[in-house]
């Protein structure tokens, strides 16, 4: 399949809407062409291109809803998918929380498409792999990494006259570097809007340095430490916390934002006053589609403002039930910070621990967002503003809510992607006090 133009996408969606005999019909057409290259043990192992386009049709008879999808787009296929969705809707029980399709909306385009990223070809990917592998091989180090890039489009339409179309690109690179004896490990990751900003031959040096310097790690006693979390390390915890910003879960007593006696903490001070987080689909470095999965127009809005809960995620059903205004679910998380780099935060630290990355983060207690996870790929002891020596990795038990009340200093936000999050994020490196490490890990 090719990337459909706006006119081509609209023609398909118009046919689908016209074919439907249901009370209402919503159709989403999305496609992408993505390329990738994978390398391990200093050799390219796989590369390829994935081309996929899919149409999802949702119809309703009263409060009975059915959805079907297909990846063929001739007239017969379009009729088949519509009839299948209608058959499923007739068989479905009524949805007590059914909400009708949204009305016609107006969307302001966001800059989610980059020409340089869309122009990436196999030669570009091969050069990224070569620029990652060659310096490692020359220094007796072992590189393993993955680059994935792509371009795509999304279009949505419904029987109320709503229509939207926008093109997108994506670029994501990660590389882990190990010493030959496996005792040292370093990592670097880049999630970018514009591939022109990527320099593999420079970024690989970060992972190489950390791999070399993380050998001969010393054991520190578990306990509470001042830490500097690099943006990738902080992003995993913060993105996990944002899953609990549902107004419904807070109102029903299932969230750290639930209020004793009922209700939620909207408007209350929950974090350090330096914590501000917004969603903005038009952010130049971290743009997202200007609509959410229901077609609701996204807007620039504060989620946390000076430590106060400024907005919660109200679904259309819950907003109607509670007498609130529904807003689109955010697609990005943009946290404010200062101007310092991670290195500058290190230079201003008397004693502490630098954490490159956190991983395998899991929930311990949803009422406090207590999380557990591990550090990896470069954990270092800081003394008198300098990296003194590597330390063995830790298991941590920490709540990002407590973490964001123990801020010493915030650095300059950078774009990162969480390992298990769909958010596009701008997160600063952060210096925190009393971060809780509970045990040691022998992994590197």
Task: Walk through the language-model features, giving the residues of each.
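Dual-mode signal for accessory low-complexity, basic/Gly-rich regions
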Residues: 262-444
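Active-site bordering "gate/hinge" segments
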Residues: 1-289, 296, 305-308, 331, ...
């Amino acid at each position: 399949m090719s990337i459909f133009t706006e006119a081509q996408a609209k023609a398909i969606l118009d046919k689908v809407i016209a074919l439907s005999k249901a009370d209402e019909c919503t159709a989403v057409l999305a496609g992408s062409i993505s390329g990738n290259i994978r390398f391990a043990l200093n050799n390219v192992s796989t590369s390829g291109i994935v081309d996929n386009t899919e149409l999802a049709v949702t119809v309703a008879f009263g409060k009975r809803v059915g959805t079907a999808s297909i990846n063929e787009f001739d007239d017969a296929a379009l009729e088949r998918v519509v009839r299948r969705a209608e058959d499923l809707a007739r068989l479905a029980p009524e949805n007590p929380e059914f909400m009708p399709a949204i009305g016609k909306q107006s969307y302001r385009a966001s800059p989610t498409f980059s020409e340089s990223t869309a122009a990436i070809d196999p030669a570009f990917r091969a050069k990224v792999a070569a620029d990652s592998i060659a310096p490692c091989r020359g220094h007796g180090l072992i590189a393993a990494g993955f680059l994935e890039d792509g371009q795509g489009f999304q279009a949505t339409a419904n029987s109320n006259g709503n229509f939207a179309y926008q093109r997108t690109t994506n670029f994501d690179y990660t590389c882990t570097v190990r010493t030959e004896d496996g005792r040292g490990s370093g990592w670097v990751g880049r999630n970018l809007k514009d591939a022109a900003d990527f320099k593999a031959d420079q970024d690989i040096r970060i992972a190489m340095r950390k791999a070399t310097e993380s050998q001969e790690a010393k054991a520190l006693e578990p306990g509470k430490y001042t830490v500097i979390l690099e943006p990738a390390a902080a992003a995993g915890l913060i993105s996990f916390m944002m899953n609990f910003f549902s107004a419904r879960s807070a109102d029903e007593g299932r969230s750290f934002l639930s209020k004793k006696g009922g209700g939620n903490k909207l408007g209350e001070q929950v974090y350090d006053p330096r914590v501000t987080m917004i969603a903005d689909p038009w952010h130049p470095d971290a743009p997202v589609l200007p609509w959410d999965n229901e077609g609701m127009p996204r807007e620039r809005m504060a989620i946390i403002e000076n430590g106060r809960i400024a907005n919660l995620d109200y679904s259309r059903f819950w907003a109607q039930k509670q007498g609130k205004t529904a807003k689109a679910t955010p697609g990005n998380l943009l946290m404010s910070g200062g101007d310092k780099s991670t290195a500058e935060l290190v230079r201003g630290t008397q004693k502490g621990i630098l954490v490159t990355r956190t991983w395998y983060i899991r929930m311990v207690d949803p009422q406090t967002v207590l999380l557990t996870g591990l550090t990896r790929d470069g954990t270092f002891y800081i003394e008198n503003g300098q990296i003194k020596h590597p330390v063995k990795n830790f298991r941590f038990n920490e709540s990002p809510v407590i973490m964001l009340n123990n801020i010493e200093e915030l650095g300059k936000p950078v774009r990162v992607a969480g390992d298990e999050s769909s958010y596009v994020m701008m997160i600063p490196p952060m210096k925190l006090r009393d971060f809780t490490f509970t045990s040691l890990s022998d992994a590197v």
